Amino acid sequence: MGNDKTNMIIAIALSLAVLLGWNYFVAAPQVERQRQQQAQTSASPSPKEGGPSAPVPGTLPGASGGNPQAALTREEALARSPRVRIDTEALKGSVALKGGRIDDVALKGYHETVDPKSPEIVLLSPAGSANPYYAEFGWVGQGAGPLPNGDTVWTADGDLLTAKKPLTLTWDNGAGLVFRRTLSVDDKYMFTVEDSVENKGQSAVTLYPYGLVSRWGKPHTQGYYVLHEGLIGVLGDKGLQEYTYDKMAKENPLGSPGTRGLSWPGVTGGFLGITDKYWAAATIPDQKTPYTGSFTERDEGATKVYQTSSLGEARTLAPGAGVQASQHLFAGAKEVSTIDAYRQKLDIKQFDLMIDWGWFYFITKPMFKALDFFYKLFGNFGVSILVVTLILKLFFLPIANRSYVSMAKMKAVQPEMTAIRERYADDKVKQQQAMMELYRKEKINPVAGCWPVVIQIPVFFALYKVLFVTIEMRHAPFFGWIRDLAAPDPTSVLNLFGLLPFAAPDLVHLGVWPIVMGITMFLQMKMNPAPPDPVQAQVFTFMPIIFTFMLGSFPAGLVIYWAWNNLLSILQQYWIMRRNGVKVELWDNLRTTFSRSSPVKAAKG
C-alpha cells in the first residue's frame, strides 16, 4: 500500500524543510549580525592605552612581492632564494632564507590521483610562482629600525630541517636588534616557530608578533554546499568562522587600500588558516595570549590575495632586554587522528573543526569513528561500511519493528480503507473521520511508517559527509573495479562497462553500483501494493529510476551503503511481515508489473 511511501515523502520533505528553515531563519541571521559587529569593530581599530598605536589588521606583511606579471615555474621561483631542505616522514620541501618563509611543502604518501606513480600533492609554493601559497612569521612595530620582511636574507645554522634536527635563523638589523627564529617540525604536519628579539640598542622599542598564511589567486574548489573551502578559523570565544573566497569579496574595506576583510580583536585560543577539501595550512597562536585575528582579501593587480593572520599584543623591549613569541604552523593532510592528537597535545581550541563535519557533527564524527574501527579490523573501508550499516539496522530494529507492524496492520485493513474511500468519495471530511476511527479501532499509528525514514535521513547525511570530507576515504578501495570509495563508480552502461573504447559523459554517468542500488530500491517498493492514487503510483514507479541516475555521480561508498541498506530493509520487512501473518506481496507485484503487456500480446495473437 501507499501510506508508508507517502510517509517517506512527507518525512523527507519535513526534514529538508527543517534544515533549510534553520539555516534561513536562525543560522543566517546570526552570521549576518556577527558579520556586522565584526565590520564595525574592524573599521575603527583603537590604539592601546598608554602605548603606541597598534598596527591595523590588513596592513601586515605577506601580501606584497608575491606574483610577478609573468609567473615563474615553481623550480625557478624556488631558485630565487637560498634554501634549507625539509625532510620528514610526512613532508618534504624547504625553508626560504630570503624572507624566512615556509613556502615549499609537499606531502609524502599523498598523490594527485589513485595511481601511486602520479605526482605527490604540493601544498605550499613560493612567491613568484604561478600560485604562491606560504606561511610567514615575524614582528611589526614602530621606531625599531628595519624589521624582517620578504626580502630579508637570514643566516641559517644548518642545511637540513628534520623531526630530530631543528633549524635556527639569525638576522641583525644593524640598528641594535638581533632577530632569531628556531624552526622545528614533528613527524607529521606541525611546525613550531619560536621567534626571539634581543635589544642591543640604546632605546626601548615596541614590537608585535604576527603569523600569517597567504594564498595568491582563487584555487579550484569542489563547489559543493556541504563542503567549506576557503578561510577558516576558531577565534577564541567568537567560535568557528568560515568564509569562502567569494564571500570575502563582499566584506568591508580593512587596512590598506584595495583590502577587504574583518577582524576579531582581543581573542584567545584557536587557529586561523586556509582549507581545501583534504589539505590545510593554518597558524596557531599561543593559546593563552590574546591576539587580533583577521581574514582579508587584497587586490594585487588582477590577482586576489587571501590571507589569515594573527597579531599579538605589544611587547616592549628595554635596552639589553629580550622578548620571545612562540607559534605553530599546521601544513598538511587533514587526517582525523592527527588533527585530534594535535588538539589534545597542544590544547588547540576546537582544532577538530578544521575538518568540516557539518551540522550533524554529533552523528558524523561517531560515524567516522565506527567506520575507522572496523577498517582497522578488516582492512577495507567498503567492508566497514557494510558492517556499520548492519549494526545500525540491528540497533534501530525495535523502532523499525513497530513501524513495520503498524504497516502490516494497515495492509490487513486495506479492504476497509478502500470501502471508506468509495463510500465517502465526495466528502473528504467524513472520509478522513472514518479513516481515523478505523485507525483508533485497530490501534494503528498512521505515521509510524515515517520513523525508519526519519532516522535514516541524518544517518545518510552523516555517512555522505564522512565519505565526502575525510581524507581517510580518499583513494580507499573496495573490491573489483572500485578503487576509490570517495569517487563515483568508474564504470558506465553507455560504454558497456568499459568494453567499448570511449569515456562516458559525466552527465549520464551510470555505473554498476548505481544500477544495483536502483534494483534494490525497486524491489523494496514492490514489497507493498501500488497506491490507489494513479499519480502516486506513477511517482513511485519512476522513483528508483530517478534515484539511479541521481546517485550515478555520488561517491561509490555512499551508493554501496544505500544498496546494502535497501537489501537489509527488504529482508527485515519480509521477516516482520511473515512473523505477523501478513502476506508478502513482492512476487505477486513483480508478476503483475512484468505481465501488464500480456493482454495486449494475447489480443494481437
UniProtKB/Swiss-Prot annotation:
The chain crosses the membrane at residues 8-28, 377-397, 451-471, 496-516, 540-560. Keywords: Cell inner membrane, Cell membrane, Chaperone, Membrane, Protein transport, Transmembrane, Transmembrane helix, Transport. One of its GO terms (molecular function) is membrane insertase activity. GO terms for biological process: protein insertion into membrane; protein transport. It comes from the Bacteria. GO terms for cellular component: plasma membrane. Residues 35-47 have a biased composition (Low complexity). It is found in: Cell inner membrane. InterPro entries: Membr_insert_YidC (IPR019998), Membr_insert_YidC_N (IPR028053), YidC/ALB3/OXA1/COX18 (IPR001708), YidC/Oxa/ALB_C (IPR028055), YidC_ALB_C (IPR047196), YidC_periplasmic_sf (IPR038221). Pfam families: 60KD_IMP (PF02096), YidC_periplas (PF14849). Residues 35-71 are annotated as: Disordered. It is a multi-pass membrane protein. Required for the insertion and/or proper folding and/or complex formation of integral membrane proteins into the membrane. Involved in integration of membrane proteins that insert both dependently and independently of the Sec translocase complex, as well as at least some lipoproteins. Aids folding of multispanning membrane proteins. HAMAP family: YidC_type1 (MF_01810). Interacts with the Sec translocase complex via SecD. Specifically interacts with transmembrane segments of nascent integral membrane proteins during membrane integration. Belongs to the OXA1/ALB3/YidC family. Type 1 subfamily. This is Membrane protein insertase YidC. It comes from Methylobacterium nodulans (strain LMG 21967 / CNCM I-2342 / ORS 2060).
